[in-house]
Amino acid sequence: AYMFWQLMHAEEPYLTDDLSEEMKVARTTTIGDLNRLRKVIEKYDLKIKGKANTGLALCGDEYKIRLFILENIYEQLYLNFPLGQIIREKLYDFQERLSMDALGFGFFYRFFVVMIQRMESGHTIKKLEPKYEELYGSSAYMIVDEFLNEIEQVKGYKISKEERLFLSISVAGMRTPANTAEIEQKISISEGVADLIIEILDRIKAELNVTVVANELFDDF
């Protein structure tokens, strides 16, 4: 987790010797860890390019980087991420307003934290695949759009459409009580988006050792 964190924030190629020194391990251990990391991130179309003696760089789509974080190392990196009291209050107000259960809110919260941290470190989503673009204008998008308008006022910077779409993924298809006025009971999403959400939930289930019943979180597609 530490190695990925350093590489994803590096503004220039990272020397293997520097990683070894920071992690307080032998160079051979670092190289072995790098090789294992390369294999893990390969399925996300992410690569660690460069050479040990000239510097290494993490290459790949920002969305895929976030997906890897959410599915694999969120707890190690963001467990105590400082959001500030005002932002936390707005998040909990959002949960209460939509009558979100703990699991559903936890899913949304993770997406939000990763989005904020990546944006504030200068790493924004420039483009998403067409299957995610279809969320634009959906109920999920409108809910997130309104919420992020409030966050913009607190943060003092603009949040792009692409970032709003990213956060919408965490809301799309979520089941809420029929009497919740601010979200439609049924949100139509594509099979691709649904598969993505289910895959991430499976990862969260494995990390937290809790059972997730898919039909409690998703509407029929």
Enumerate the language-model features and the residues they cover:
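A cross-family "folded-core" feature that marks the main globular domain of proteins
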Residues: A1-F221
